Amino acid sequence: MKIFDYENIQLIPNKCIVNSRSECDTTVTLGRHTFKMPIVPANMQTIINDSIAEFLAENGYFYIMHRFDGAARIPFVKKMKERQWISSISVGVKKEEYLFIEELAKQKLASDYITIDIAHGHSNSVIEMIQHIKTHLPETFVIAGNVGTPEAVRELENAGADATKVGIGPGKACITKIKTGFGTGGWQLAALRWCAKAARKPIIADGGIRTHGDIAKSIRFGATMVMIGSLFAGHEESSGETKIENGIAYKEYFGSASEFQKGEKKNIEGKKIWIQHKGSLKDTLIEMHQDLQSSISYAGGRDLEAIRKVDYVIVKNSIFNGDAI
């Protein structure tokens, strides 16, 4: 198996067939809905909140609400359904989560999407939760993760998952690879390729995205959707504290298994970092959209499918040659 990551890959351009990149279609279908772009902000406390979820849903973007305010999820699903926007939430695998799924069913509040969100998703606990959701909410699109092997993808698909989330510890705020010695950090793109070859259902690439070009690379190697954390951190709309240092504004960004999220020093696999303030989330989404349209034009097509067919080269060291990203 070839081992590489985003910084080791360069996609090879084809003849451009559009007169303007604005002709390129970045839409993607996941389940019963079509979205503006194949991107989703990470379901982390400093990345997604109610107001951001509402903005994304209203404007045709996919989102996954985090699971760290359990009591707020039923009111959230109700609100999104009342506004006729998609509802997309996260669950864990503890006993109370089973009761939560049953309560959704009892109230006839089937969320459009439910993501089973644990660090090591290739486990009996995730398989049992997939089956529980499908029993009580059969119409819900279930995303299960996180995983890093073809065996895990197939097993979760066979259990009933409609999509799997690939990536163990490659994110900027994740230290799983350091704390445990395991994960896809440093070879996330190769792991995505490996898993995609076995997958029969959509894959969400999760983690390791450092540039907008990495979105196109994820699509090339099999992702239907790309989950992004650090690039969506630090915006005006983002949750988390703001601090000023030497006249420059920063916003906090922490991993989902950090002590800042957990509130305790136990099984820590995340850290807190400060991200320079980036301004408006809307501006970042516009730039991502334009860059992805450019990627499609370089691929020689009019839609995302063109990116899946391009050739690539593996660069020996890094495409950045020491330049700051």
From Swiss-Prot:
Pfam families, alphabetized: IMPDH
Enzyme Commission no: 1.7.1.7
One GO MF term: GMP reductase activity
SMART domains per record: IMPDH
Keyword Membrane: no
GO cellular-component term (any): GMP reductase complex
Enzyme active site: 174
SUPFAM superfamilies in the record: Inosine monophosphate dehydrogenase (IMPDH) (SSF51412)
Catalytically driven reaction(s): IMP + NH4(+) + NADP(+) = GMP + NADPH + 2 H(+)
KW Transcription regulation (keyword) present: no
Membrane-crossing residue ranges in chain numbering: none
GO biological process: purine nucleotide metabolic process
Function: Catalyzes the irreversible NADPH-dependent deamination of GMP to IMP. It functions in the conversion of nucleobase, nucleoside and nucleotide derivatives of G to A nucleotides, and in maintaining the intracellular balance of A and G nucleotides.
HAMAP family the record matches: GMP_reduct_type2
Name by which UniProt lists this protein: GMP reductase
Species: Helicobacter pylori (strain Shi470)
Gene name, Swiss-Prot/TrEMBL: guaC
